[in-house]
Amino acid sequence: FNAASYSDELRTRECLANPLHTLPSRAMLTDALGQWSNARRLHRWLLIQGSQPEDLAYAEALKRSAKRFGLKIIEEKTWSFDTDLRRTAQRELPLFTQTEEYVLVVVADERGDFGEYVMYNTWYPRPVAGTQGLTPVAWHRVVEQWGAAKMQHRLEDKYQVWMNSKVYVAWVALRTIGEAVTKTKSNNAEILFNFINSDKFHLAAFKGRKLNYRSWSGQLRQPIPLVQPRSLVSQPPLEGFLHPVTDLDTLGFDQPESSCNVSYASN
């Protein structure tokens, strides 16, 4: 199970043996943001990216999503400074974001070097989304529907922590194994893998939908919460974004976009 890497390459070109990805790919996260932005008619983006490899990967996913959902990136900017923004954000960021008018600022700063300071400091008073601001995630403590609040409280009572994305996808991996063993009444790895990767497998995971895995890449199909620190804003896929198989496949790379063809390998 991959519960650690958001890499799009692992779902499209660098196809590993026996992969099951419970963590969503970057493309799934940014496609959720793209759907919401399209639905809200926030069609003009200013993209600000960091200089780290993971920032560049997130920025590429944002650009792909913008093209996919008919959005325009009016300018791309790279934050490559080592300024202490705790002291200078109000002076430097308005000038840095002064450009042709935009309606949404999208940030690619996975490490958190500058993104937290972009909000409320842009040249135009516009919302911020991406790795900071309105953020697409696998899970967040503000997800409380579909029985999720009870699960959140159980974890908090037992371990004194809130469930986050990494904890959630690790839990989903364990639930996947438990569900497969229960349904197949087998502990054979090949039998379990083939069942999990079939259309017979479904998993209840507190997201309001039955979840399963994409047979070609091993990626878990799942809704993506869009959150701010204290509330759930939306949970794509949204109504109106259609797909011939399932609207969950409007998030991330669909089968024709991936060269992976997952099958069981014993070694």
Report each predicted region and the residues it spans.
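Extracytosolic ligand-binding ectodomains
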Residues: F1-N267
